[in-house]
Amino acid sequence: MRLFTLILMVVLALVQRQLWFGKNGLVEYRQVSENLLRRQADNQKLQERNMLLKEDIEDLKSGLEAIEELARNDLGFIKSGETFYRVLPRDSAGQNKQSSLPKSD
């Protein structure tokens, strides 16, 4: 009877070891679950970004307002008759930073 109990304890220990540390065990399950949650969060962020990009594409396809806005903001275009003022931030010495745009005469 003692030998039978000892054999059962060894078998139980082996099964527990396999459950906790073996392939597809609880430790690996926890790691895979955490990885899955991270991937789902990344996918959600990417889906939101894709939606914004799709909206931008539709705006660009449908009207000139979005194109005009991009040209004004990114390329510095101005309409004829407008006056453009650029406000430069101050650097750490308290002086205005110089613009990288060439001066026009």
Swiss-Prot record:
* Positions in the Cytoplasmic compartment: 1-3
Which GO BP terms, alphabetically?
FtsZ-dependent cytokinesis
Q: Which residue ranges run through the membrane?
A: 4-21
Main localization of the protein? membrane
Ordered alphabetically, the record's keywords are: Cell cycle, Cell division, Cell inner membrane, Cell membrane, Coiled coil, Membrane, Transmembrane, Transmembrane helix
**Cellular component annotations (GO), alphabetically ordered:** cell division site; cell septum; plasma membrane
Q: Where in the cell is it found?
A: Cell inner membrane
Give the membrane topology. Single-pass type II membrane protein
- Identify the residue ranges that face the Periplasmic compartment according to the record: 22-105
Parts forming coiled coils: 28-74
What domain of life?
Bacteria
Instruction: Say what the protein does.
Output: Essential cell division protein. May link together the upstream cell division proteins, which are predominantly cytoplasmic, with the downstream cell division proteins, which are predominantly periplasmic.
- Would you identify the family this protein belongs to, as annotated? Belongs to the FtsB family.
Q: Which NCBIfam families match?
A: PRK00888.1
Question: What is said about its interaction partners and assembly?
Answer: Part of a complex composed of FtsB, FtsL and FtsQ.
HAMAP family given in the database record: FtsB (MF_00599)
Q: Output this protein's name.
A: Cell division protein FtsB
Origin species, per record, is: Tolumonas auensis (strain DSM 9187 / NBRC 110442 / TA 4)
* Origin organism lineage: Bacteria, Pseudomonadati, Pseudomonadota, Gammaproteobacteria, Aeromonadales
